[in-house]
Amino acid sequence: MKAVLFDMDGTLVDSEKLWEVALHVLYSRLGGELTPAIREATVGGSAESLMQMVYTDLGLDLDPDEMAAHSEWLHDYTADLFDGGLPWCDGARELLDTLADAAVPMALVTNTRRALTERALDSIGRHYFTASVCGDEVVSPKPAPDPYQRAAELLGFTPAQCLAIEDSVTGAASAEDAGCPVLVVPNDVEVPGSARRRHVGSLAGVGIAELQRIYSQLQPGLRS
């Protein structure tokens, strides 16, 4: 294991609840009501896929300009919520500190747009990360492998040399398809298992030795 690639929303910080608040308000503005099924389907998705899902769910015309305007509103509203402070997921900050103290390279890999990610980094601490990749900076965001491929490249490693930490179906698929072994932490939506994934109850108490062990189990034959 040469580096660790972190998802942001729901993995490091419990920002998914703030996204849910913003989505409820957006649905009200559009004359509808957010259902649990739609909320579950949007977790980990890109801005574009989210708006398509919302408009399709409400039976609205897929007008690109109107969708873009509502997407901007949603991100601005969420940014204001982010500015109120982002609660840490269990064990996340401690793991970042441990990895930073050991000089393990880290990258942030998120489907969130750059502008909103920068607001989040004000709360999380940008000093932890050598690089960050956002959903609006790649040709295809998660679940495509592009974000994780790009993050590994920026760190100077192959995806197989990096352990990805994710909480969503789309994020785990993105990391796995890029070639990363994946450590999955729980969120509201269950992530299916696979031969290249390991699940933990939370990041609380997880240290470098545990990450190395998981990495070795998921990458047989590779030196960690």
Predicted feature residues:
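Active-site neighborhood of HAD-like aspartate-dependent phosphohydrolases
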Residues: 1-40
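Asp-based, Mg2+/Mn2+-dependent phosphohydrolase catalytic module
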Residues: 1-2, 97-100, 113-224
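Conserved phosphate-coupling serine/threonine residues in phosphotransfer and NTP-handling enzymes
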Residues: 11, 110-112
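An amphipathic alpha-helix signature
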Residues: 20, 24, 47-52, 71, ...
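Helix-loop "lid/cap" segments that line or gate small-molecule binding pockets
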Residues: 24-27, 48-62, 120, 152
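Short helix-capping segments at alpha-helix termini
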Residues: 29-33, 58-62, 102, 124-128, ...
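Metal-dependent phosphoesterase signature
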Residues: 33, 55-94
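Catalytic-core regions built around general acid/base machinery
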Residues: 91-104
